[in-house]
C-alpha cells in the first residue's frame, strides 16, 4: 500500500530534523550550547550531564506512558521501562545505603511535596531553615505550597558565626512543637549535624526529613556525611553536585514506602518521565565510580581555593567578606552587606567577564531579595569540565580581581582569561551544532 500524498508529506515532516521543522528553536539551541561552552558556569545548583544522559533524555522513552510502578502499571507495553526503573531504584539503594527509593519525582520540589503529603497533615507545624538564611522555598516560604498548606516556622543561623546551631534549632522546636523538622539547605556553605537534629526531632516527637539536593553528589562520593542513617526521609534532586538530569528522587526507611509511593503517584503526579528516569539510572551508575569521587574532590578543593582568594585583603578592602569564613561544600557565599556593590551588580559584573553565578540573600540582609547582598558561587560544573587546582586558582583570581575592583574592573582583560579557560576545557566537543 502507498500513503496518500498528504500522509507522505506528514511522514516526511515527522522525520525531519529540527533545523528544518523549527529553525528558530534550532538556532536558540545552538546559541545555548555556545553559551555553555564559551563561558564558565558557576551557579551552585547547575552542572553538566554526561553525554549518555543527554542520549537518554532525547530517546524514544519520551513516548512511553507508564502510570504506576514496575509490575503494577496501568498501561501495557511497560516491559522495558519496568526494567529501567527497577535498575534506577536498585542502583540508588546501593549508592546511598537506603531501604527504599522512589525515582519518579519530576523535580526536587515535587519530591518535597510528596514528603509533606506522606509525613504530615495540612495545618501541621513544620520547622525549617529560613529562606533568607539559606533555606529553600519548599521548606516553608509563605507563598510556596509548603507555607500555604502547612504552618511553617523557621530557625535561623547563629547571628555571630552565621552557622546552623543545633541549640537554636532545639529552642525553636521546643517553642513551636513541630510535627516535622527539616534539614538541608539551598545556600549554606557548611556541614549540618544530622545526628543532633535527629535527637532534637526525637525529643519533641517530630519526623526528621533532610533535603540533600545540593550535596547529594558529595554524599554519594563519601565526602560529606550522609543523612540517610538519621533521617526518616531524604529527598534530593539528581542534578546540582550529582550531575544527572534535572529531576528528583526520595530515599527513606522501608516503613514509609507505602505512604511515599502513594504520595508520588497518584498523590502528586501521573505518569513518570521514563526518559528522565533512564538518565537517573545512568547517573546513579556514574556516581559509583572512582572518576566521580575524584570529580567531587576537585569540586570541594575548588570551592576552598575560591574562598581563600575571596578572603584576600584586596577583596576585603571593597567591603566584601566570605560568609562563615570559608566552606565545607561545593559553594561559597559572598557577603556584600558592607560593600557599595549589591548582589545584582556583582552578578552582572561577573557575567560581563564570562562567569555565570547568581545573587542571593544572606542572613540579616538589609537589601531586598531582588538585588540582595550576597553572591552564591559554585564549583561543580567546572569540575565536570575537568578543572583542577591550577584552573581553580585562575578562576578564583579572576573573580577576586573583579570583585575587588568593582565597576572599575578591566572586564576585557578578565574576559580574555575566562575565554582561555573555556577553550582549554571544551564542553561536549563531539556534540555537533544543529545547524
Curated annotation (Swiss-Prot):
Q: Give EC number(s), comma-separated.
A: 2.1.2.1
Coiled-coil region(s) at which residues?
Answer: none
Q: Positions of the site: Plays an important role in substrate specificity? A: 239
Question: What are the names of the required cofactors?
Answer: pyridoxal 5'-phosphate
Pathway in which the depicted protein is active: One-carbon metabolism; tetrahydrofolate interconversion; Amino-acid biosynthesis; glycine biosynthesis; glycine from L-serine: step 1/1
Annotated (6S)-5,6,7,8-tetrahydrofolate binding lies at 131, 135-137
Q: Which GO terms describe its molecular function?
A: glycine hydroxymethyltransferase activity; pyridoxal phosphate binding
Entry protein name? Serine hydroxymethyltransferase
Q: Where does this one sit in the cell?
A: Cytoplasm
Pfam families for this protein: SHMT
Lineage, top ranks = Bacteria, Bacillati, Actinomycetota, Actinomycetes, Bifidobacteriales
Kindly state the subunit structure of this protein: Homodimer.
Amino acid at each position: 500500500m502507498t500513503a496518500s500524498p498528504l500522509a507522505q508529506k506528514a511522514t516526511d515532516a515527522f522525520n525531519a530534523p529540527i533545523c528544518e521543522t523549527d529553525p528558530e528553536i534550532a538556532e536558540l539551541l545552538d546559541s545555548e550550547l555556545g553559551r555553555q561552552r564559551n563561558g564558565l558556569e558557576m551557579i551552585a545548583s547547575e552542572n553538566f550531564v554526561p553525554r549518555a544522559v543527554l542520549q537518554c533524555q532525547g530517546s524514544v522513552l519520551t513516548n512511553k506512558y507508564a502510570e504506576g510502578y514496575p509490575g503494577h502499571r496501568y498501561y501495557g507495553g511497560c516491559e522495558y521501562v519496568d526494567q529501567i526503573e527497577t535498575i534506577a531504584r536498585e542502583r540508588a539503594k546501593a549508592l546511598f545505603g537506603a531501604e527504599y527509593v522512589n525515582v519518579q519525582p519530576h523535580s526536587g520540589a515535587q519530591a518535597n511535596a510528596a514528603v509533606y503529603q506522606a509525613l504530615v497533615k495540612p495545618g501541621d507545624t513544620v520547622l525549617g531553615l529560613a529562606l533568607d538564611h539559606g533555606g529553600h522555598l519548599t521548606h516553608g516560604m509563605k507563598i510556596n505550597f509548603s507555607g500555604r498548606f502547612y504552618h511553617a516556622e523557621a530557625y535561623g543561623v547563629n547571628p555571630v558565626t552565621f552557622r546552623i546551631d543545633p541549640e537554636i534549632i532545639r529552642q525553636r522546636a521546643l517553642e513551636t512543637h513541630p510535627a516535622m523538622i527539616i534539614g538541608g539547605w539551598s545556600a549554606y556553605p557548611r556541614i549540618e549535624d544530622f545526628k543532633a537534629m535527629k535527637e532534637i526531632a526525637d525529643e519533641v516527637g517530630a519526623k526528621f526529613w533532610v533535603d540533600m539536593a545540593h550535596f547529594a553528589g558529595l554524599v554519594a562520593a563519601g565526602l560529606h556525611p550522609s543523612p540517610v542513617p538519621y533521617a526518616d526521609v531524604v529527598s534530593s534532586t539528581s542534578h546540582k553536585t550529582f550531575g544527572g538530569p534535572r529531576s528528583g528522587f526520595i530515599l527513606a526507611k522501608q516503613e514509609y514506602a507505602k505512604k511515599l509511593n502513594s504520595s508520588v503517584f497518584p498523590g502528586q503526579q501521573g505518569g513518570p518521565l521514563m526518559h528522565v528516569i533512564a538518565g537517573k539510572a545512568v547517573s546513579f551508575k556514574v556516581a559509583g565510580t572512582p572518576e566521580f569521587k575524584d570529580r567531587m574532590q576537585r569540586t570541594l578543593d575548588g570551592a576552598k581555593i575560591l574562598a581563600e582568594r575571596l578572603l584576600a585583603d584586596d577583596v576585603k578592602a571593597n567591603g566584601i567578606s566570605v560568609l562563615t569564613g570559608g566552606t565545607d561544600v561545593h559553594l561559597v557565599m559572598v557577603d556584600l552587606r558592607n560593600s557599595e556593590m549589591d548582589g545584582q551588580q556583582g552578578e552582572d559584573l561577573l557575567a560581563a567577564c564570562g562567569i555565570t553565578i547568581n545573587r542571593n540573600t544572606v542572613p540579616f540582609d538589609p537589601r531586598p531579595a531582588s538585588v540582595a547582598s550576597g553572591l552564591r558561587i559554585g564549583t561543580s560544573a567546572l569540575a565536570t569540565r575537568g578543572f583542577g587546582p591550577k584552573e581553580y586558582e585562575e578562576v578564583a583570581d579572576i573573580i577576586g580581581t573583579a570583585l575587588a575592583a568593582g565597576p572599575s574592573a578591566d572586564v576585557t582583560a578578565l574576559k580574555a582569561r575566562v575565554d582561555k579557560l573555556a577553550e582549554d576545557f571544551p564542553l561536549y566537543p563531539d556534540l555537533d551544532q544543529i545547524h
